[in-house]
C-alpha cells in the first residue's frame, strides 16, 4: 500500500521539524525512515534567510563564550583627548653661519629662558678689529602651539672703533629737566673708552610769546 502526501500538511511538517526530526521517523507517522534532513525543512530554512532568529532573553553560543574586546585605537584616542599635554617652550638655541669664514674664531650665541620674569640673554664674541654694526632679532611664540618663528641677523664690519655716534634728546614739556646725559661705553683692545653727551637747558623768557613760555 502506497501512502499519499498532500501539500496541505506542509506547515505541520515544518513545525515538527522545529520540534525534532525524530517525529517523522516514528512508526505511527506511516512514512519510511528518512536518513537525510527533510526536504520541506531545508526549504523552510532557506526561505527564512539561512539563520534562526534568536529567542528573546537568550544569547547565541558564540556571543556567550567570546567576550567583547574594546579596540585599542579607540582607547588610545580617548585617553589622549582626556590627558592632552600642554605645550610650553623650555629652551631655545640658534647658530649663525659666516661666509667667508673670518681669520679667527667668531661665536654668536643666543638663548631664551621662559620663567616668571622671561629673560632674554645674548652673548657675542668676536676677534679683535671687528665690531657689531647692527643686530636685529625677532622671536614670535604662540601659546599652546608648536609653531615657532625666529629671525636673527648680525652684521660685522672691520672697524676698530666707532666713527660716529649720534645722540638725540627729546624734551617733554610736562616734565622739564635742566640736564640730560647720555653715556656710551666702548671696549676696544680691553681698554675702556667712554663717550659722554650732555644737554643743559636754561629757563628763559620770550617777549611777546606768552603762550610758548607757558608751554615750556
From Swiss-Prot:
**Location of the region described as Disordered in the Swiss-Prot/TrEMBL record:** 1-55
Q: Which GO terms describe its molecular function?
A: filamin binding
Q: Which GO terms describe its cellular component?
A: actin cytoskeleton; actin filament bundle; cytoplasm
Keyword Phosphoprotein among UniProt keywords = yes
Record keywords: Cytoplasm, Cytoskeleton, Phosphoprotein
Query: What biological processes does GO assign it?
Result: actin cytoskeleton organization; actin filament bundle organization; epithelial to mesenchymal transition; negative regulation of bone mineralization involved in bone maturation; negative regulation of chondrocyte development; skeletal system morphogenesis
Where would you find this protein in the cell? Cytoplasm, Cytoskeleton
Q: Which Pfam families match?
A: FAM101 (PF15068)
Q: What protein is this chain from?
A: Refilin-B
Instruction: State the family it belongs to.
Output: Belongs to the Refilin family.
Question: Quick check: keyword Chaperone in the entry?
Answer: no
Q: Which residues carry this modification: Phosphoserine?
A: 6, 26
State how it assembles.
Interacts with FLNA and FLNB.
Q: What happens when the gene is disrupted?
A: No visible phenotype; probably due to redundancy with RFLN. RFLNA and RFLNB double mutant mice exhibit severe skeletal malformations, as characterized by scoliosis, kyphosis, intervertebral disks defects, vertebral fusion in the spine and longitudinal bone growth retardation. Chondrocyte maturation is accelerated in double mutant mice.
Q: Which InterPro entries match?
A: Refilin
Top-level division of the source organism's lineage: Eukaryota
Protein task:
Involved in the regulation of the perinuclear actin network and nuclear shape through interaction with filamins. Plays an essential role in the formation of cartilaginous skeletal elements.
- The chain's coiled-coil residues are none
Q: Which tissues carry this protein?
A: Detected in various tissues, with highest expression in lung, followed by spleen.
Amino acid at each position: 500500500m502506497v501512502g499519499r502526501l498532500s501539500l496541505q500538511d506542509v506547515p505541520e511538517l515544518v513545525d515538527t521539524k522545529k520540534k525534532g526530526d525524530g517525529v517523522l521517523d516514528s512508526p505511527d507517522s506511516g512514512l519510511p525512515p528518512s536518513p537525510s534532513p527533510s526536504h520541506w525543512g531545508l526549504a523552510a530554512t532557506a526561505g527564512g534567510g539561512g539563520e534562526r532568529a534568536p529567542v528573546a532573553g537568550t544569547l547565541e553560543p558564540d556571543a556567550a563564550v567570546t567576550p567583547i574586546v574594546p579596540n585599542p585605537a579607540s582607547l588610545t584616542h580617548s585617553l589622549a583627548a582626556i590627558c592632552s599635554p600642554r605645550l610650553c617652550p623650555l629652551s631655545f638655541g640658534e647658530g649663525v653661519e659666516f661666509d667667508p669664514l673670518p681669520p679667527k674664531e667668531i661665536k654668536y650665541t643666543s638663548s631664551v629662558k621662559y620663567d616668571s620674569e622671561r629673560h632674554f640673554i645674548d652673548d657675542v664674541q668676536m676677534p679683535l678689529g671687528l665690531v657689531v654694526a647692527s643686530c636685529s632679532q625677532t622671536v614670535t611664540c604662540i601659546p599652546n602651539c608648536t609653531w615657532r618663528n625666529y629671525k636673527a641677523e648680525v652684521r660685522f664690519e672691520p672697524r676698530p672703533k666707532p666713527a660716529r655716534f649720534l645722540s638725540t634728546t627729546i624734551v617733554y614739556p610736562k616734565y622739564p629737566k635742566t640736564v640730560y646725559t647720555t653715556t656710551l661705553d666702548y671696549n676696544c683692545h680691553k681698554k675702556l673708552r667712554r663717550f659722554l653727551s650732555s644737554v643743559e637747558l636754561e629757563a628763559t623768557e620770550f617777549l611777546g610769546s606768552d603762550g610758548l613760555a607757558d608751554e615750556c
